[in-house]
Amino acid sequence: MRTSQYLLSTQKETPADAEVISHQLMLRAGMIRKLASGLYTWLPTGVRVLKKVENIVREEMNNAGAIEVSMPVVQPADLWQESGRWEQYGPELLRFVDRGERPFVLGPTHEEVITDLIRGEINSYKQLPLNFFQIQTKFRDEVRPRFGVMRAREFLMKDAYSFHTTQESLQETYDAMYTAYSKIFSRMDLNFRAVLADTGSIGGSASHEFQVLAESGEDDIVFSTGSDYAANIEFAEALAPTEPRAPATEELRIVDTPNAKTIAELVEQFKLPIEKTVKTLLVHAHEESGHKLVALLVRGDHDLNEIKAEKLPQVAKPLTFASEEEIRAAIGAGPGSLGPVNLSLPVIADRSVAVMSDFGAGANIDGKHYFGINWERDLALPLVADLRNVVEGDISPDGKGTLQIKRGIEVGHIFQLGTKYSEVMKATVQGEDGRNQVMTMGCYGIGVSRVVAAAIEQNHDDRGIIWPDAIAPFQVAILPMNMHKSFRVKELAEELYTTLRSHGIDVILDDRKERPGVMFADMELIGVPHNIVIGDRNLDSEEVEYKNRRVGEKQMIKTSEIVEFLLSQIKR
């Protein structure tokens, strides 16, 4: 490619509305342009990276035995009604009607479509297992699109779906996809971890996320210092404290706290250790519980894990916090004064709360708190459950080592769906015994466009992007100084350009009539890994300058050795 025949579209200024570095650099490097909220046009440089990612994904899917298909983005509503997700999915599912008043959705995922397809195509256990994949546009009507393509409404995704007659067969494919995903992200030179995860709205049993480690990540992921345990913080179990509850040393007393409506204010004003306080959170109760609200107790320095709480049978799904009006109607006090003593609601305490003594909590009277609360003496110990997020230093759930926490960007997710979709949609085959058998399913997703942003979050400096070779828009940039005035500079540049292309190298020749500083800045910004600078002065000694974008060091290479040198440097 020649810059004179290419849309480079680089920008010097950082866009004001770009929050994270990947969004900033994708705009500045001319990779994307915003069309509307959460909608982006991919420009040539962005498309080149996107295609590199796609190709790696496709190669490894083929190597893992998956078969490529292509399914419509527009899906009939009756499939979603049949699966039960028409009501469950929520406002992220964009629904519309066609001119015949028939309801449809823009697909955020394709479980229903693939299940409908396979139940009509497969009829015998002898045809299984099968694994199908596609690389297709998805749409989720995010309430707050942000971070550029990281959380866009329209995005490119690789989704795969496998069908089986036994759990053993599903596990075999699941393991193969786990291995394939590891190969995909390793080929892209990404620093990633596979972590245990919640299945979320997709459903199913076992699940792993593939997280690219980055400070800008939206997810907290936890690792054990003593084993290979790794999980999303939403999934990680907080073990019960091993120390027994300390005996009571304080009397129960009620204290005026008119200016303490939060745990932080209570701690500051009364010099209480925060680990001696309890937060009381009211959420909607499950309709079969016979109550409107249920109280959840967590220690003052801990955060409620909403995923864990939502799984409790006493709690309504989706988890919904009570409004101040609902709280006052039920308790007679505001949310800043709630506590478990004399509370006429079902109560569930976190494991760490169950071993507390002499603690403080709201008195269910505005402007008042109880101090010196003790279980069994002042109130009965309620139902106890794991309700909180783990924190650094907690014992690992496998009992080996302690936990550390890092930020991550989810780029892949694999699930063992079981019969969640196939059973309700009656996707059956004739089993070995001649009877109909519901197929068991797995599903496996990679956010292809999100991978591009995640790679930038890990690979950049103050001058721009530093692409890994495998997904760089161009592997080599040829920068000829004053080629329009120097015949020998132009001659070598053209010769090198032709030779590298013949070796299958993605190369860009900057043949613009631009100042050297502009040429250097643009190639650094778009992140070309290997740069060759050709100048008259160096040609006097039959040399060119090579600069590695990641290392930053320059070295002189003999003109006769350039091609061989570059082929040895490029990871292919």
From Swiss-Prot:
**In which compartments does the protein localize?**
Cytoplasm
Which InterPro entries is this protein grouped with?
A: aa-tRNA-synt_IIb, aa-tRNA-synth_II, aa-tRNA-synth_II/BPL/LPL, Anticodon-bd, Anticodon-bd_dom_sf, Pro-tRNA-ligase_IIa, Pro-tRNA-synth_IIa_bac-type, Pro-tRNA-Synthase_IIa_type1
Q: What is its EC number?
A: 6.1.1.15
Assembly: Homodimer.
Molecular function (GO) terms listed? aminoacyl-tRNA deacylase activity; ATP binding; proline-tRNA ligase activity
- Name the Gene3D superfamilies for this protein: Anticodon-binding domain (3.40.50.800), Bira Bifunctional Protein, Domain 2 (3.30.930.10), YbaK/aminoacyl-tRNA synthetase-associated domain (3.90.960.10)
Is Protein biosynthesis one of the keywords UniProt gives this record? Answer: yes
Q: Which family does it belong to?
A: Belongs to the class-II aminoacyl-tRNA synthetase family. ProS type 1 subfamily.
State what this protein does.
Answer: Catalyzes the attachment of proline to tRNA(Pro) in a two-step reaction: proline is first activated by ATP to form Pro-AMP and then transferred to the acceptor end of tRNA(Pro). As ProRS can inadvertently accommodate and process non-cognate amino acids such as alanine and cysteine, to avoid such errors it has two additional distinct editing activities against alanine. One activity is designated as 'pretransfer' editing and involves the tRNA(Pro)-independent hydrolysis of activated Ala-AMP.
Q: What is known of its domains?
A: Consists of three domains: the N-terminal catalytic domain, the editing domain and the C-terminal anticodon-binding domain.
Q: Which UniProt keywords apply?
A: Aminoacyl-tRNA synthetase, ATP-binding, Cytoplasm, Ligase, Nucleotide-binding, Protein biosynthesis
Q: Which reaction does it catalyse?
A: tRNA(Pro) + L-proline + ATP = L-prolyl-tRNA(Pro) + AMP + diphosphate
Query: What's one GO BP annotation on this UniProt entry?
Result: prolyl-tRNA aminoacylation
Task: Give the protein's recorded name.
Answer: Proline--tRNA ligase
Q: Which NCBIfam families match?
A: PRK09194.1, proS_fam_II
The Gene Ontology CC terms held by the record are:
cytosol
